[in-house]
């Protein structure tokens, strides 16, 4: 899209909004930024350096004096300013969409409810290794932390942009076209944004492939019921190539000509030539990178790498040296025979369930935060089998205590420090303390990263590991 001379309003002056503003201004657009609150000092300085005008403490009618608008991902379609923009027929895009207009590089897009950051990190690691051999660069951008707009002008045609995508970022995508798209899974999350409608949430995720063509590839989790219904059976008429991944020997029967699957301790690759063994799951399921969910993450990354033409030997070596991502079932330390695991990124019940499945032995669970309408009853079976104590915190504390009363021992804590102290008292040698909230962090913390860091700090304050 040629933006030169066009008027662009950016709604939201946080990290991605300011990055989009800078990109569009450099590309010749007449940019205006509107922020409901107040831009941070760094963001205000960047806008001033580019000569971009902005308003704060509210949105005026000037926002609608635009040829198009770019909205920050945290602003829902129900916000008053967004309704005004749409009512006036002004095109509304996401920062990802705007950045894609200027992208010369290949794109691998990764979305899903859970696993997208680990899968993105794995694929980026694989691509970096391949790029060293084949003279290209791999960039990691998007929901993972660095806005796509910040780096897109640095990318050459041979390079690869690994773009992690939330449903919020995909909502405003119209022409965004990944060469390879990956959907890790779709389970209930963020439904407050979608009026409790799972189909609306899924539709936002499915925008990742809306512009893909015959030369492109979609990689999806065959074991996810919603995704299987959408994509299995010879591609269901989609124009692009479809590659499923999953656990078990039923994946090759998905109807696709190619698949990656884990069976009998081995990752295998189905092609027209037959089934080959990629490598043993034990090679990457180490103490710091373990669990069934990480098999899925590895399968997704391997399938995406293959679709990008990366040799399996390169991918295998890169994955074998991977130690995981911070706040995602992160081993913190062993203290008096008790292992402590930080899974602060578990912001929904499905992620909590995966963590409980992944951790061997008896567990003291610290959970809670801002509830998202969670159904904790799906955890009953694994809690009965593995959890000796549930320690509940945050706004969801009373709900969690009530749900698990009679299922296992329960206790409430006012603060995270108190919860850690209770866990220290409760856990016995050979057990694991798992911090996997299953809830959003915003009732007590700035974000899940701060929550995880404070959990680790609290452990180390008890006794340096």
From Swiss-Prot:
Gene3D superfamilies: Mur ligase, C-terminal domain (3.90.190.20), Mur-like, catalytic domain (3.40.1190.10), NAD(P)-binding Rossmann-like Domain (3.40.50.720). Pathway: Cell wall biogenesis; peptidoglycan biosynthesis. This is UDP-N-acetylmuramoylalanine--D-glutamate ligase. Belongs to the MurCDEF family. It is found in: Cytoplasm. GO terms for cellular component: cytoplasm. SUPFAM superfamilies: MurCD N-terminal domain (SSF51984), MurD-like peptide ligases, catalytic domain (SSF53623), MurD-like peptide ligases, peptide-binding domain (SSF53244). It comes from the Bacteria. Cell wall formation. Catalyzes the addition of glutamate to the nucleotide precursor UDP-N-acetylmuramoyl-L-alanine (UMA). The keyword Cell cycle applies. The gene is murD. Its EC number is 6.3.2.9. It is an enzyme of class 6 (ligase). Keywords: ATP-binding, Cell cycle, Cell division, Cell shape, Cell wall biogenesis/degradation, Cytoplasm, Ligase, Nucleotide-binding, Peptidoglycan synthesis. ATP binds at residues 112-118. It comes from Chlorobium limicola (strain DSM 245 / NBRC 103803 / 6330).
